[in-house]
């Protein structure tokens, strides 16, 4: 552990990829880093509270960050912002990258899976399959419709089912497999690998269990091999990882809509509002809650001089509720005229190249649900994951169709 001149108590980076580190060293690193996050959270640091990932609702912690000004320093060693204007300038600037010099993680980046992890690479070009028009849209719509009809064949009957496991995850995964050309006999493997990779984005900033990290590392290698025959295998890999974001986005959208019944009824009456529902969800409760950057060279930010290697975190979810930009930001509103001013799934972010496909999957899922089950309602408690400060979405949502 190190205590630098800024007062930050941090863990030194591993300096090697997950695969190159023995279980004992990796496990110790994960436990000690998580302990540091708990200490800082207990001492009142809101960003450490976010990293700890124990709250169902992280938005109160985001507001505590906002109250500290446009840019504040966390004792975890990161500079943090919830300010929309500042965040936009960071995300669009070439002064910031995804890792330190020569691709080496900085201390605030808990671990590295190496060059094979698309979330640790600069994203420049659209990923494979990220052209959501024409034939691909038809494929996605057909698979979503078939999945829901298989779950609930009689639209006039009453059904109780788990939204994510029963419909959203199978439909989104199957549609992605079809778009990416995964062989039919490997699609069950594809789905299993994506489930093991669900905590991948969280694990880069928030320590997971040793078993979870090992499972994700192995799944990343297996998925890379599975997609190796793609015309653009790196892009295909990123597109596959976008499945998690699409599932989370859909889950967040449905929860927001069902919590505002008049908005759900509006969507059922006007299915064309599905795209607006997706954009408002991206503002209100996005699937990727934050985006981390590393300063490439000494720079000034919000009146502060930041050295090369400084770690800067954009709380994307918080910027979507910035009262300086959005009127009544705590209200979910399908008619909001400026919802698309959010910074979620930013083109320069890790999921930027697959943002169109993520949006398409969520839009189609909402249209399909609203068209078949206008009486849909939540029928039980929502289950959410822990240690998930980056990816936000429910694990389980019991619903009833009547």
Curated annotation (Swiss-Prot):
Please give the InterPro entries that the UniProt record associates with this protein.
Cyt_P450, Cyt_P450_B, Cyt_P450_sf, P450-rel_GT_act
Task: State the Pfam families in the record.
Answer: p450
Q: Per UniProt, which keywords does this protein have?
A: Antibiotic biosynthesis
Q: In Gene Ontology terms, what is a biological process of this protein? A: antibiotic biosynthetic process
Keyword Cell membrane present in the record's keywords: the answer is: no
Kindly give the NCBIfam families that the UniProt entry links to this protein. Answer: P450_rel_GT_act
Listed under subunit, the entry gives:
Forms a complex with DesVII.
Q: What is this protein called?
A: Protein DesVIII
Traced from the root, the source organism's taxonomic lineage reads: Bacteria, Bacillati, Actinomycetota, Actinomycetes, Kitasatosporales
């Amino acid at each position: 552990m190190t205590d630098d001149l800024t007062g930050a108590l941090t863990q030194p980076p591993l300096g090697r990829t997950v695969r190159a580190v023995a279980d004992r060293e990796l496990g110790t690193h994960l436990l000690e880093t998580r302990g540091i996050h708990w200490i800082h959270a207990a001492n009142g640091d809101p960003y450490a509270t976010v990293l700890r990932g124990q709250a169902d609702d992280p938005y109160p912690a985001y507001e505590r960050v906002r109250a500290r000004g446009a840019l504040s320093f966390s004792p975890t060693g990161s500079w943090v912002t919830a300010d929309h204007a500042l965040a936009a300038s960071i995300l669009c600037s070439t002064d910031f990258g995804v890792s330190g010099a020569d691709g080496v993680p900085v201390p605030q980046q808990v671990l590295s899976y190496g060059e094979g992890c698309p979330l640790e690479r600069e994203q420049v070009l659209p990923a494979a399959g990220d052209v959501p028009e024409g034939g691909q849209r038809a494929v996605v719509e057909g698979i979503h419709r078939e999945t829901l009809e298989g779950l609930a064949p009689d639209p006039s009957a009453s059904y109780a089912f788990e939204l994510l496991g029963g419909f959203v995850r199978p439909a989104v995964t199957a549609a992605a497999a079809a778009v990416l050309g995964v062989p039919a006999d490997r699609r069950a493997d594809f789905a299993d690998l994506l489930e093991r990779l669900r905590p991948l984005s969280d694990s880069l900033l928030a320590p997971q269990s040793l078993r979870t990290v090992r499972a994700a590392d192995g799944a990343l290698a297996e998925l890379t091999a599975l997609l190796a025959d793609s015309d653009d295998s790196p892009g295909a890999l990123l597109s596959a990882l976008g499945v998690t974001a699409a599932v989370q986005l859909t889950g967040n959208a449905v929860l927001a809509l069902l919590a505002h019944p008049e908005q759900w009824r509006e969507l059922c009456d006007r299915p064309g509002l599905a795209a607006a529902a997706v954009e408002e969800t991206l503002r209100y409760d996005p699937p990727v809650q934050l985006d981390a950057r590393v300063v490439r060279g000494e720079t000034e930010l919000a009146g502060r001089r930041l050295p090369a290697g400084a770690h800067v975190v954009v709380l994307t979810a918080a910027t979507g509720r910035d009262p300086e930009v959005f009127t009544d930001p705590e209200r979910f509103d399908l008619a909001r005229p400026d919802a698309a001013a959010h910074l979620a799934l930013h083109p320069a972010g890790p999921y930027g190249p697959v943002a169109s496909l993520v949006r398409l999957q969520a839009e189609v899922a909402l249209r399909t649900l609203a068209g078949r089950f206008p009486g849909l309602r939540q029928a039980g408690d929502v289950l959410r994951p822990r240690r998930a400060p980056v990816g936000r979405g429910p694990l389980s949502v019991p619903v009833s169709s009547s």
